[in-house]
Amino acid sequence: MTFKAITGAALCATMLTFSGQAFADAELKIFVSSQHQPDVWRKAIDQYEAKTPGVKVVIETGGNTSEMQAQYLNTVMSAKDSSLDVLMLDVIRPAQFATAGWTSDFSGKDMSAYLPTYAEANTVDGKIVALPAFADSMFLYYRKDLLDKYGIQPPTTWDELKEAAKKVMEGEKNPELQGLSFQGKAIEGAVCTFLLPYWSEGKSLVENGKLNFDNKAAVDSLKLWKSFVDEGISKKNISEVATDDTRKEFQAGKVLFAVNWSYAWTHFQGKESQVNDKVGVARLPAVKGGEQTTCLGGWEFGVSAYSKQQDEAKKLVEYLSGQDVSKFMAINATLLPTYASLYKDADVTKAIPWFADALPVVETAKARPVTPRYNEVSETIRTTVNGVLAGVMTPEDAAKQMESRLRRVLR
């Protein structure tokens, strides 16, 4: 895993330029997910530096998955390292980091302007422990040109998706075309993979901090995903596919349907994309007789408890979490806003038309379990899902093992 600093000190393949004073009264270092367009965050930070004389901000990036980033940050925080001032955290992490004493509180912060889901995600034991960076949820991306060619409407159930995929794949006779790509690798995305059909059956995994495991819904979910592989709709090695693999395959024109987050849209519309202007976005399908639902995502900014520049770090986070930056990142990076009003903002909807319909999806997205022991919950679910997709476990055995392991964590 390689982590790199983005500064204006040098120009090379792994560094980006920035404008700022050569000598600053305060130099802050912020960790940003490498998957979420740090080059665009750099532009937002450039604006902050221009407005804040004497402050220089260096971006450190790294890790292509939530797990890799968390592993790195866990190491830094466990060592009480003061080198990082601001941390970009997956929405599932604030409770864990706050409980460990790794983040500073934003005392007195009014969270009412944010989408309620994100105000709640950043509040732990009544304390504001981080501020929203951007919202997110999973969507179904599809090849609009191919569905139109075969007279198919975007599917609202997984069964409809199967039928559509088989029809298009048979008609196209392209051995490289997959019907569906999703996250089967043992990463955080596989937790959402499991939960989507499980939630669609109306089941919850945790209630009031206690496990509420439904074995039938779990087996149904695992069987559904395995069936996509067995029926030739998804690739045989789907157990090796991570989030950005799905994005790259769809972008290369090799996938009909893809389950992915909002960041993928900008890539699909890029100059190197094979599907530019051929992509549609829809809500994720439901199981038969179930409800359409999706997995809540998003990222947050926390201030390291070990930062030696607490006030300056908090001012930077307040700025990056503000409405102006949220709008800037929506338009320039396709990152969903954390403010409801921006989903109807004329500039935003002109740049990203489908954002106009995204707010109800984000507002009704379901959150993964919030617990200080989330790492153990995640590891249990994602490795079990991966085992089923790799063919080393049956859905029935996997569901039993998953429940047993989760009960030891969520007592």
Kindly give the residue locations of the regions a language model identified:
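A bilobed periplasmic-binding-protein/Venus flytrap-type ligand-binding module shared by bacterial periplasmic
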Residues: L140-K144, L296-Q309
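Short, well-ordered beta-strand elements
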Residues: D25-Q35, V55-T61, D85-V86, V129, ...
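Glycine-centered hinge/linker elements that transmit conformational signals in sensory
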Residues: A165, K210-S239, L284
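Long, aromatic- and glycine/proline-rich binding clefts that accommodate carbohydrate-like moieties
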Residues: T117, A121-N122, V279-A282, I331-T383, ...
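Extracytoplasmic "Venus flytrap"
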Residues: E27-A44, G62-N64, E188, G290, ...
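Extracytoplasmic "Venus flytrap"/periplasmic binding protein-like
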Residues: K29, Q47-T117, A121-T123, D145-T156, ...
